[in-house]
Amino acid sequence: MDEDEFELQPQEPNSFFDGIGADATHMDGDQIVVEIQEAVFVSNIVDSDITVHNFVPDDPDSVVIQDVIEDVVIEEDVQCSDILEEADVSENVIIPEQVLESDVTEEVSLPHCTVPDDVLASDITSTSTSMPEHVLTSESMHVCDIGHVEHMVHDSVVEAEIITDPLTSDIVSEEVLVADCAPEAIIDASGISVDQQDNDKASCEDYLMISLDDAGKIEHDGSTGVTIDAESEMDPCKVDSTCPEVIKVYIFKADPGEDDLGGTVDIVESEPENDHGVELLDQNSSIRVPREKMVYMTVNDSQQEDEDLNVAEIADEVYMEVIVGEEDAAVAAAAAAVHEQQIDEDEMKTFVPIAWAAAYGNNSDGIENRNGTASALLHIDESAGLGRLAKQKPKKKRRPDSRQYQTAIIIGPDGHPLTVYPCMICGKKFKSRGFLKRHMKNHPEHLAKKKYHCTDCDYTTNKKISLHNHLESHKLTSKAEKAIECDECGKHFSHAGALFTHKMVHKEKGANKMHKCKFCEYETAEQGLLNRHLLAVHSKNFPHICVECGKGFRHPSELKKHMRIHTGEKPYQCQYCEYRSADSSNLKTHIKTKHSKEMPFKCDICLLTFSDTKEVQQHTLVHQESKTHQCLHCDHKSSNSSDLKRHVISVHTKDYPHKCEMCEKGFHRPSELKKHVAVHKGKKMHQCRHCDFKIADPFVLSRHILSVHTKDLPFRCKRCRKGFRQQNELKKHMKTHSGRKVYQCEYCEYSTTDASGFKRHVISIHTKDYPHRCEYCKKGFRRPSEKNQHIMRHHKEVGLP
């Protein structure tokens, strides 16, 4: 048989278990080979203890074998002993290694290693086939004499398939059967008989402790092996087959001749430290230590009698820790994010996206596990005979970010402490703050919760300055509420309506009180009438007063526009629709907003719009032609003779041959009179309450009342001793003595040269229309408020209707 050359290549976390059958040749020494992800140092010390750790040894002659994922350190002076006489011996072992970042191929002579042809282990075959999801286990694989490494493979080789896909949720099957000599490679968990007949086994065997992390209750009935009770309380993630599982495997040194291994052990809060090397570090009093399901397994002879488990006296040293499942944190986190959307919100999320050992330094207080509680911390004791076991102090825990995120320290794959960012909601841990921020989007119900809440209302915000500004608004509101004060008694009210009701009480008490003007002898029983008197008579800034509401204006044109609010007159009508407006500016705005599409053509100078191009061209001629037609009476210029004629007739012609039969108003042209007559259609005549004057225009009636029926006329004409309320009215009156045409009122002695003033006089003075009548005395009023005040004053025993 030719000599085989094989390569040692590290694989993903797989375990090789040796099942010693009845026909297998028994050799002294350790009987288990474990392939792990971390760096492994195999010592050649012939002792009952073996050192396996993840630190670089002190021996400078060690050969370093590196791979992308893991590092393995093996001393060069490894010897192999003859175990199988019929097997061929592999003289040369080619081991690729990276020393000082350079690729070196070194031949290590193993003169006594026997490698048969039917080697199926993926890390021993010459083809170096990578099988991350399968573990090929021989029935005889031994590590003997502590410092001598042997790989033995018999003819009857079976294949054990262990699924370690990080995206598969059921990593640990619901039932683990342990037997011996089965068609498949089975891990025997039967207890080791105390009365072992082979007393020559003086060396120790290696045993495994598998932490299932509350995957289910592990039961052992002696004959059938170790099973997982699927009826026990399971994780929701496992039921849905969406969450990956992490298995922790702890390898112990124990003496099979003295201890019975196998079965299940529950480590509870009352067992802070046991006899088998697993120490539960002290936790804070406020953190509850959860129960952890653990099973201890060993390779045992199938012919041994089943005994009850006794793990109280297991060996004092844990010398290896292996984690199976979730090798890649990023892939697991991505898979968890995909499945998390399908999990019900009420179900508890019970998986952790990082496959690192959850261990802390001495100064760590704890970390939330995937169930939201603090997990017990496992401590690996140091053996007295292991002098070369390096001690590594973990880095100090970083100060947590008090603003948003907290940090935790765990032991990474390379053995060094790493800072992670745990999610405080589901317990997931991430390498960077950015991954945590991205993960927090999966908890919208918690992101919606805001930090700051207003104690006075339901306002919430995440910014402190926003809450401060909101509280200031409460202060301003409280001040504004207190700002409404009664001027008679000083009482404060929250709104104007309450103040108005309160003032009615004062009016009832002082119903007979007369309000006097401080500038003249005018007096009235109503405060509102006194206010209007002050505005109309003694106000210089707003001489033109509205008799309906008492509002003053600087110019008569403004008062005229305002009076349309009370009369409801809307003389401006849209030529495209039935829209009417009391103001020309509102009509222009209406046309631009509503009919801009109907008139797409605009003038570039004045921005007026037209329906077609011909109208635009005709309109532009107005801007292009020079205004050559000069008015002989003023500085007005027109672009054509027709415009000039229209200007002369309307401004400089005092003869109005066309008179209105209803209001006696004159016009220059019949068309103007026709438009004016249309105003009177549908309108009722307004009668003055002081005289027989009536007019259709209420504005003229208001001017009539103010000018004729007001006794206070401080401005007197020196020539005719006629009185006027304002100085500008006196100036207009003085023009009547200069020979100009005077408009004489037919109802009184009022006369003026101003046609608009004459119209206002007739409306304000000689109008007698009071639409709001009292139901009890039939007295008329101009506004409903005046009628209500009258009822409260004179008919208070009846009350408001």
Curated annotation (Swiss-Prot):
GO biological process terms on file: regulation of transcription by RNA polymerase II
Sorted UniProt keywords: Activator, DNA-binding, Metal-binding, Nucleus, Phosphoprotein, Repeat, Transcription, Transcription regulation, Zinc, Zinc-finger
Primary location class: nucleus
InterPro entries: Transcrp_activ_Zfx/Zfy-dom, Znf_C2H2_sf, Znf_C2H2_type
Compartment(s) of residence: Nucleus
Coiled-coil annotated residue ranges, if any: none
Residues with the Phosphoserine modification: S270
GO MF, one example: RNA polymerase II transcription regulatory region sequence-specific DNA binding
C2H2-type zinc-finger residues: 421-443, 452-474, 484-506, 515-538, 544-566, 572-595, 601-623, 629-652, 658-680, 686-709, 715-737, 743-766, 772-795
Domain of life: Eukaryota
Gene Ontology annotations for the cellular component aspect, listed alphabetically: nucleus
Gene3D superfamilies found in the cross-reference section: Classic Zinc Finger
SUPFAM superfamilies in the cross-refs: beta-beta-alpha zinc fingers
Function: Probable transcriptional activator. Binds to the consensus sequence 5'-AGGCCY-3'.
Domain remark from Swiss-Prot or TrEMBL: The binding of ZFY to DNA is mediated by the interaction of the GGCC core base pairs with zinc fingers 12 and 13.
Family affiliation: Belongs to the krueppel C2H2-type zinc-finger protein family. ZFX/ZFY subfamily.
Protein's recorded name: Zinc finger Y-chromosomal protein
